[in-house]
Each structure stands twice: as C-alpha cells, then as structure tokens.
C-alpha cells in the first residue's frame, strides 16, 4: 500500500497532462489535477456537449489530437468502447518517445485493442469510486483509494509517475494498491457481470416475478426485492456481512442463512467460473467489440427488453411517491 509519503507530487507537476474525456472520472481527475498545480488540458471532440461545462469550470479544452500533441502524459478516460478508435486516430499519431499513456481501466490494453508504441510508458490509475466521490473527497482534503499498475516502463519511472498522478487526485491520502492490468480488468468485469450488475439484476427480477406470479401485489414485491436492497447493501458497505446480519432481525438472519445457499448454490458458482473463463480468454470482449462494430444492436435490444420489465413500470410509479429519492433525468423529463 502506498500513501502520501510514498509519492512525489512534483513529478506530475513537472509534466503536461491531457485528459481525454470529461465524464464521471474525467471531470474529477481534471479539476483535482489543476488544483494540485498540474498543467492540464481536456480533450473532447468538436461539438461535444461537455465542452461548455469544461470551459465554465476554467479548464482548457481542445480536440483529443491537439491535446495529445501538447501533453506528455495522456490519461484516457473516454468510454471503453470508444477508446481504440480515439487512440488510433488522435492519440497514437501524436505520441512522442518518453511520453506516458495512462488509463482508468485496463480493458483495451489488456485485450490488445490498444497497442501502445514501445517507447512510451503505459500505466493505470483507477480510483475505486465514482467521479463525484473522488472529487468531493479531494475537495474535503481526503481521498478515495486507487489502484495503480504499470504495463510498460521503458524509462523505469512509470510507478513513480503513476503514484504522483494518484497523489494529485487525492488517492494517496486514502491508500494506493499496486496491481496489474490483467488483474484489474478481469476482476472488474467479473464483478460487474456476476454480482454487481448482471447477478443482482437477475436475482431482483426473479424474486419479483415469483411473488407476483404467486398473487402478491406488484407494489409489495417491488419494495421487498428492490427498494429495500439499498438498506442491506449500505450495511454491507459500512461493515461487511457481519454488520448486515447484526443489524437485521434474528428472523431475517436465520432465514438468510437457511435459504441463501438454496438460491445461490454450487451450480451458480460453477456458472460463475464459466463466465470468468469467458472473460479471461477474451470471449466476452470479442462479443462486445462485435456488437459495437455492428452498431450496438444487441445492446439496444437488451436495453429495450429490460426497460419493459414489469418491475420497471411499477418502480417508476412508486418512486413518484418518494420525495427523498433523487430522480434521474429520464424519469423527470
């Protein structure tokens, strides 16, 4: 683990950093780098809706190609599915020997969608939290833990540069963990697909469907399997599984111990292993790239099917009653 005393802020202060993208992480990195005394410019395509926001926040903005030409550290924070095209068209032609190419996620490099030239350093600085939290913690004098990894290090200074960058966005205040592009990428994809997004979503929908099919009101089913999920996850987030079980009733704890293994059993675990193998051997990324190249047709169809699920219909109606819930733009428009 690395902390403030392990990182030299002056290293990144002596470089010119171009941040490609201004989404959740892009805005947090750019503003915190600037506030740490680093020269920074944001790379966005002409006509990007984020350009006025960047300018309002006092940052310089130019095209990705011009920013890559100006910078000697390029942090790529554009969406995963756009990175390879941006790299090939805008970044790679403007890289110079001795430059550094940074990423917030290792997917494109690990699976060979981006192949950097041998004379540039390739590293990753990945905060383990959303951009708004990274920025808020930085402003409050705190930080969000980060992962760092060095994939390519022609001059031998890649780790020091990555740690300096992490310090500039507040990461070393909380702690920085050294990893590899391989481990970060594969564990991130596995967690998303089997637990955080895919697994949780299907578990919620299945529970909702079982209750509704048994004759219970959809509103009650929604509250029991989706709305209250946040209460349980928050307890786990704060103190692990033990904190969750300490905080719920004995009835809930006893029932959870008995029934949980019947829902998530050895067969589930074996299928999770299958998914991990598909991530490791590149099968998943192959499907992802094929869908992107085909115009995201499969993704759009899956989105449509998900949006039409009955839990989404009843959920929108119930959230209209919850004044304390922040509503997404799609529900308030």
From Swiss-Prot:
- EC annotation from Swiss-Prot or TrEMBL: 1.1.1.86
Q: Where is the KARI C-terminal knotted domain?
A: 180-325
**Entry-linked Pfam families:** KARI_C (PF01450), KARI_N (PF07991)
Q: Which domain of life is it from?
A: Bacteria
Q: Name one GO molecular function term.
A: magnesium ion binding
Active-site feature positions? 105
Q: Does the keyword NADP apply?
A: yes
Pathway(s): Amino-acid biosynthesis; L-isoleucine biosynthesis; L-isoleucine from 2-oxobutanoate: step 2/4; Amino-acid biosynthesis; L-valine biosynthesis; L-valine from pyruvate: step 2/4
Return the cofactor note field.
Binds 2 magnesium ions per subunit.
Looking at the record, the residues that make up the KARI N-terminal Rossmann domain are 1-179
Annotated protein name in UniProt = Ketol-acid reductoisomerase (NADP(+))
Q: Which gene encodes it?
A: ilvC
């Amino acid at each position: 683990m690395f902390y403030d005393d392990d990182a030299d802020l002056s290293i990144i202060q002596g470089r010119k950093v171009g941040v490609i993208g201004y989404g959740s992480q892009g805005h947090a990195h750019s503003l915190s780098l600037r506030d740490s005394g680093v020269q920074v410019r944001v790379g966005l395509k002409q006509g990007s809706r984020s350009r006025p926001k960047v300018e309002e926040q006092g940052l310089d903005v130019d095209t990705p190609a011009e920013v890559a030409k100006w910078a000697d550290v390029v942090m790529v924070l554009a969406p995963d599915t756009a990175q390879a095209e941006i790299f090939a068209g805008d970044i790679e032609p403007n890289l110079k020997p001795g430059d550094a190419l940074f990423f917030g996620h290792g997917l494109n490099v690990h699976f060979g969608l981006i192949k950097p030239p041998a004379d540039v350093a390739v590293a990753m600085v990945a905060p383990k939290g959303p951009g708004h939290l990274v920025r808020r913690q930085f402003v409050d004098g705190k930080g969000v833990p980060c992962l760092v990894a060095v994939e390519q290090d022609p001059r031998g200074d890649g780790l020091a540069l990555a740690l300096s960058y992490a310090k500039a966005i507040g990461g070393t205040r909380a702690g920085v963990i050294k990893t590899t592009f391989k481990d970060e990428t594969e564990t991130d994809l596995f967690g998303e697909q089997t637990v955080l997004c895919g697994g949780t979503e299907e578990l919620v929908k299945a529970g909702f469907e079982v209750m509704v099919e048994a004759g219970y009101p959809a509103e009650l089913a929604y509250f029991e399997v989706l709305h209250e999920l946040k209460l349980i996850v928050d307890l786990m987030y704060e103190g692990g599984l033990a904190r969750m079980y300490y905080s719920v009733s004995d009835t809930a704890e006893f029932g959870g111990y008995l029934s949980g293994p019947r829902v998530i059993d050895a067969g589930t675990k074996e299928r999770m292993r299958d998914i991990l193998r598909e991530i490791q051997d590149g099968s998943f990324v192959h499907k992802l790239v094929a869908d992107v190249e085909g115009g995201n047709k499969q993704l759009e169809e899956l989105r449509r099917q998900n949006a039409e699920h009955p839990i989404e219909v009843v959920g929108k109606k119930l959230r209209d009653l919850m004044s304390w819930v922040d509503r997404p733009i799609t529900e308030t428009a």
